[in-house]
């Protein structure tokens, strides 16, 4: 669990589209991060 948020924490990693494709659930989380950085766990 802490592994995913780790790279998510880095806004620069958002450019990694391939990584997002591997994790279909990540795209949703990334959207939340952009909307509310505080709610990255939402």
Swiss-Prot record:
It is found in: Secreted. It comes from the Eukaryota. Transmembrane segments: none annotated. Disulfide bonds: none annotated. Induction: By bacterial infection. Hemolymph. Keywords: Antibiotic, Antimicrobial, Fungicide, Immunity, Innate immunity, Secreted. One of its GO terms (cellular component) is extracellular space. One of its GO terms (biological process) is defense response to Gram-positive bacterium. The keyword Secreted applies. Its main location: secreted. Belongs to the lebocin family. Antimicrobial protein. Has antibacterial activity against the Gram-positive bacteria M.luteus (MIC=22.7 uM) and L.monocytogenes (MIC=90.9 uM). Lacks antibacterial activity against the Gram-positive bacteria B.circulans, S.aureus, and S.lutea, and the Gram-negative bacteria E.coli D31, E.coli ATCC 25922, and S.typhimurium. Has antifungal activity against A.niger (MIC=90.9 uM) and T.harzianum (MIC=90.9 uM), but lacks antifungal activity against S.cerevisiae, P.pastoris, Z.marxianus, C.albicans, C.fructus, and F.oxysporum. This is Lebocin-like anionic peptide 1. It comes from Galleria mellonella. The lineage of its organism: Eukaryota, Metazoa, Ecdysozoa, Arthropoda, Hexapoda.
